[in-house]
A protein has these predicted regions:
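Active-site neighborhoods and metal-handling regions in enzymes and metal-associated proteins
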Residues: 1-469
Length: 469
């Protein structure tokens, strides 16, 4: 098997690096045979501890540039490791159909002997693929994709802890930003609905920009235990810029914050114990009725998906509409997927599952211990944009019945930060949504309390006060 995706190589050998911005991976390849394992990397990047780990586990470290010639040797059955593992059955037969569960059109089992080379056609670079004979290639989705997506108990615990610390950083950021918007711009603030004080808005000498405030958010995250950097470049967007789904501000051209406009921030971090991703949309002035109703529709879809119960074997594609239906009722929608997979101190986007309106041949059913985001939105060109995002863990759930003996699944939220109440039209929420929102906010107070000081906790208590149905 030839492994080329950097996150799969990192996961396979349990190594991390810093060769790629925002992704803790190292430029490397891997080749795994029935009795050998090879790691192709710049050897100067490896610490003595990593070298010892590789040696103890029978992994042969080779120079990064050797992978090309070694693939040629692999194709002719001449690639041999000095630390080959003994005791394997010669020429074993492997049931690929059951082993990979790729979801491809060909679902029948394929038997092969160990001179076939497993290559993921959706990931392998042509430079290596071209060195192989077509009749010796098994073109299947990588067998590492699914086990990497199925988080083990240590990874799940790490993700939960990382999201708690990250949630505390987001709350600290909102507390700081709320104060700054009031002091510098005369904004009514996070809680009050009123027009900004124009006179005070004009008097301020210091300005807040999309870049300067996102830098401050990074400062709060950097103060947290195990922080190693951002997991992607922060989307910090105000007003019409928030309508650009993948907007990335530049210091020279970014907008200044405006208390009379929506502010959307989509951000995340890399911690040693987990990767985070969160989006919140806020307003520090008086939101329009249209902004409030749009945000409420997005929130209703977010809650609906997060509360879904579904049978084993269901792909995320089948759940996507749950997040869109509240928007569809108004004739609104959004042009991106609703949920992406997330790594464990790895890529913030990874495979092989997703929640999207568009089905994918490589998509696999949602399974217990997978991590996925829940992030519906709405974007109105030249006006505003809204997105709300939490990370979810797939878990088993108890249902009154069990049709088909399939077993049923649900989601567990692991992201903790308040939803702005003044952007919510409570009159269109059903009692179940109000109950969920109040329970979620109560958990925010309980879970984040140990990480906040007195003033920050007072702010959070106010931000999470129960909503009356």
């Amino acid at each position: 098997m030839i492994v080329t995706p950097l996150d799969e190589v990192a996961w396979l050998y349990n190594v991390r690096g810093s060769d790629v911005s925002y992704c803790p991976v190292v430029h490397a390849f891997a080749i795994v045979t029935i009795d050998s394992a090879f790691f192709y990397v710049d050897k100067q990047k490896l610490s003595p501890e990593t070298n010892s780990f590789m040696e103890e586990n029978g992994i042969m470290v080779r120079n990064y540039g050797d992978v090309s010639s070694d693939v040629v040797l692999l194709a002719s059955n001449q690639l041999i490791s000095s630390s080959s593992t003994k005791g394997f059955e010669e020429n074993p037969k492997i049931d690929v159909g059951n082993a990979t569960n790729t979801g491809n059109s060909s679902s029948h089992a394929v038997e092969f002997v160990n001179d076939l080379i497993w290559v993921d056609p959706g990931a392998c670079c042509f430079a290596l693929y071209s060195k192989l004979s077509v009749d010796k290639v098994l073109p299947q989705q990588s067998p590492l994709a699914l086990p990497k997506a199925l988080k083990n108990p240590v990874e799940i615990e790490g993700l939960k802890k990382a999201h708690i610390r990250d949630g505390a950083a987001v709350v600290q950021y909102l507390v700081w930003l709320d104060k700054q918007m009031q002091e510098l711009y005369g904004a009514s603030g996070y809680f009050m609905e009123a027009e900004s004080t124009k006179e005070k808005k004009q008097l301020g000498t210091r300005r807040l920009t999309e870049v300067s405030v996102s830098d401050k958010l990074e400062e709060f995250r950097a103060s947290k235990e195990h922080f190693r950097g951002l997991s992607f470049r922060t989307t910090s967007s105000v007003g019409s810029n928030a309508a650009i789904i993948h907007y990335k501000p530049e210091a020279e051209t970014c907008a200044e914050l405006d208390p009379d406009c929506i502010y959307l921030f989509d951000s995340g971090a890399q911690y040693l114990d987990g990767t985070t991703d969160i989006t919140r949309t806020v307003h520090f002035g008086k939101p329009t009725p249209h902004e409030k109703s749009s945000n409420t529709a997005v929130l209703k879809g977010h809650i609906s998906l997060g509360n879904a119960r579904f049978p084993n074997g269901i792909n995320g594609h089948a759940l996507d509409a749950l997040a869109r239906i509240p928007l569809w009722k108004y004739g609104l929608d959004y042009k991106h997927g609703t949920g992406h997979r997330i790594g464990s101190y790895l890529n913030v986007h990874e495979g092989p599952h997703q929640i999207s309106l568009r089905p994918s041949a490589r998509d696999l059913p949602l399974q217990v211990s997978m991590a996925v985001t829940d992030e519906p939105g709405y974007y109105e060109d030249r006006n505003f944009g809204i997105r709300i995002e939490n990370v979810l863990i797939v878990k088993e759930c108890n249902t009154k019945f069990n049709f088909g003996d399939k077993g049923y699944l649900s989601f567990e939220h692991i992201t903790w930060a308040p939803y702005q109440r003044k952007l919510i039209d409570v009159s269109v929420l059903v009692p179940e949504e109000v109950e969920w929102l109040n329970e979620y906010h109560a958990k925010c107070r309980e879970i984040l309390a140990p990480y906040l000081n007195t003033s920050e906790m007072e702010w959070l208590k106010k931000a999470t006060e129960p909503i009356a149905a």
